[in-house]
Design a protein with these regions (language model features):
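Repeated loop/turn-to-beta-strand initiation elements of outer-membrane beta-barrel proteins
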Residues: 203, 228-230, 257-263, 292-298, ...
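Membrane-embedded beta-strand positions of outer-membrane beta-barrel proteins
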Residues: 230-232, 251, 263-267, 296-300, ...
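Outer-membrane beta-barrel "beta-signal"
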Residues: 251, 326, 524-530, 535, ...
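Periplasmic polypeptide-binding modules associated with outer-membrane biogenesis and secretion
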Residues: 25-238, 268-281, 441-443
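Transmembrane beta-strands of outer-membrane beta-barrel pores
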Residues: 234-238, 255, 267-273, 291, ...
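Residues that define the transmembrane beta-barrel architecture of outer-membrane proteins
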Residues: 214, 243-247, 279-283, 320-324, ...
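Extracellular loop and loop/strand-boundary signature of outer-membrane beta-barrel proteins
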Residues: 180, 235-237, 270-273, 310-315, ...
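C-terminal outer-membrane beta-barrel translocator/porin domains of Gram-negative envelope proteins
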Residues: 352-494, 499-503, 507-509, 561
């Protein structure tokens, strides 16, 4: 039975927590930080993977709007009229934003060809903005008045129907548009992305004329390949003291409520140790459901570890970390080349550390943080950029337990204020006679406060700076890393060799006694697929730059294999 170390018995730990930690703190804090960083990175990658694949299926518009194209000259005509005002009207308020789009052509002489030219210009602007069934018409008028009037006739959605009505799906939860709404391509694409984010589900859309003028019927053909999907994974991303080789099982359950919802579960465990006192395991569950332009997601996980420590007498160090996160994402703006969303999160974590089944009460943590952010995806030629800018703040509420000494006398605090930037840029590059791919991934956090180890930024390992094993890391209250990778896909053989160079840097009050602040590493590897179910990634990394005295292997092998079913 575990015994909790109460406050009266932990005075020594409490008085030295902010300056010179005891042996117990030395053993557990760095390790938990390292393991928590690895677990958080893997959870983040699993959460992002399905959405990334769905979004990349979108195609860009070939239309160029007036705002992004150079202004074209009016055609010269013998019969023309002086026009001082160009008026654009519509029965729908959404088109009021176009009322000044042609004002640059005012105070010119315009004839019949000029009217047709301007009508075409405005029509192309509507197409570029996604109003693919709305029309620009020229009503009867007298140009001697000095005014030229265009009218935008809105195109509407008459109905949205499933071509296979027996499909286990509700399109209303995915699409931010209903019958009677003005038809806009971006709203339909948002619904398609929401439906494609469901594993094993694909959708094709056609727009057909409706039964009334300027009305269209949107037909959806949904292909569903089962409602349960899974994968088995094996890698060597673990720690020597708790299990280098990690095995994982992932299961996803789609359409439980028929709302394009997804329940994802995973179980990860070391397969290196059995009954020798070492080991680690992790459970994770997440559930997401769309609501048109909004997506709700809740996730929870629990991570635990055991290890034997010899300092100099043997004892068992163990710990648990569990967390719950609730997130809401709202699309703010979507064009043919970009999507911008607002994100809000509430994050709660609990951590407990033990020595020989005795809980170190002073190290127990119950923390809560709120986060707001902006995410942006941009398409530019053959380049796709994803950026997420966030602000996160620890709060004293919603289950958090804040101690009175936090933040005093250089002690760390859970009531931190932090900003961060993360994302990736992917673009095609020529490599000899073949088309290659360059990818830059980056992540950062910035604060001027001293943080607990589990909130610090960690570098060194496959999830940050490759070329390092992750057994030893550099940590700081603030930091960043950038991963650069050049890949050359051989699509016929389903093999992609790659080479990478990564850099990371940390700083802040907690780095005062650290060996250094910067790591640079390199990696060469190959990833690919075998058939439709097996994926693999094998690489060899090496340190390029590290602080003197920083202990790490000169060659770091990494592998990951998975089987999908």
């Amino acid at each position: 039975m575990r015994v909790v170390c109460i406050a009266a018995g932990c005075v020594g730990l409490l008085t030295t927590f902010g300056t010179m930690p005891t042996i117990a703190a030395k053993v557990s804090n760095p390790f938990i930080q390292q393991e928590a960083a690895r677990a958080d990175a893997s959870l983040r990658q699993r959460a992002e993977a399905p959405m990334t694949g769905a979004a990349l299926l979108r195609s860009e518009s070939t239309y160029v709007g007036l705002s992004s194209a150079p202004m074209k000259a009016l055609p010269k005509e013998e019969i023309a009229f002086p026009i001082d005002h160009i008026i654009i009207t519509s029965s729908e308020p959404v088109f009021r934003k176009y009322k000044n789009r042609l004002e640059g052509y005012e105070h010119n002489r315009i004839g019949s060809n000029g009217v047709t030219f301007l009508q075409k210009q405005l029509q192309e602007q509507l197409l570029a903005d996604g109003y693919v069934t709305s029309q620009v018409v020229v009503p009867n008028q007298d140009l001697h008045s000095g005014s030229l009037i265009f009218e935008i006739l809105p195109g509407y959605v008459e109905d949205i129907v499933l071509t296979n009505p027996k499909a286990r799906i509700n399109w209303r939860s995915a699409f931010p548009v209903r019958p009677g709404y003005v038809l806009r391509r971006q709203a339909l694409e948002q619904g398609i992305d929401q439906m494609r984010s469901v594993p094993g589900q694909d959708i094709k859309m056609t727009i057909e004329p409706g039964t009334k003028p300027l009305h269209s019927i949107v037909k959806l053909t949904v292909e569903q390949k089962g409602f349960v999907h899974g994968s088995l994974m094996l890698d060597n991303s673990g720690n020597k003291s708790t299990g280098m080789y990690q095995g994982a099982v992932f299961l996803s359950f789609s359409q439980l409520a028929g709302l394009n919802d997804v329940l994802t579960t995973s179980f990860t465990k070391d397969i290196s140790h059995h009954d020798d006192g070492h080991g680690s395991k992790q459970y994770a569950v997440s559930y997401s459901v769309p609501d048109g332009n909004r997506t709700y997601r809740i996730s929870t996980y629990k991570y635990s570890y055991n290890q034997l420590v010899f300092m100099p007498n043997a004892f068992r160090s163990s710990g648990t970390t569990q967390g719950t996160e609730f997130a809401v994402e709202q699309v703010l703006n979507r064009t043919s080349r970009s999507k911008t969303s607002a994100v809000a999160k509430v994050i709660h974590k609990e951590r407990h550390n033990y020595l020989d089944d005795v809980e170190l009460g002073v190290q127990a943590q119950h923390t809560t943080a709120v986060e707001v952010g902006l995410s942006h995806r941009q398409y530019s030629g053959n380049t796709v950029s994803d950026v997420y800018l966030f602000y996160r703040q620890g709060i004293n509420g919603l289950g958090a337990q804040v101690r009175s000494w936090e933040g005093l006398s250089d002690n760390p605090t859970t009531l931190y204020k932090m900003a961060g930037l993360e994302g990736q840029v992917q673009t095609g590059v020529r490599m000899g006679y073949k088309q290659g791919m360059y990818t830059m991934r980056f992540r950062s956090q910035f604060t001027d406060q001293r943080l607990f180890g589990t909130e610090q930024f960690s570098i060194g390992g496959r999830y940050s700076v490759r070329g390092f094993s992750g057994e030893e890391t550099l940590r700081g209250d603030s930091g960043y890393y950038v991963q650069n990778e050049w890949a050359l896909p051989f699509r016929k053989q389903q093999v992609t060799p790659y080479v990478g160079v990564d850099i990371g840097h940390v700083w802040g009050p907690s780095t005062e006694t650290q060996l250094g602040n910067t790591l640079v590493g390199g990696v060469v590897g190959v990833r690919g697929t075998v058939g439709d179910a097996v994926n693999y990634d094998v690489s060899l990394g090496t340190p390029i730059k590290k602080p003197e005295g920083f202990d790490t292997d000169t060659r770091v092998w990494a592998f990951r294999g998975s089987y999908q079913f």
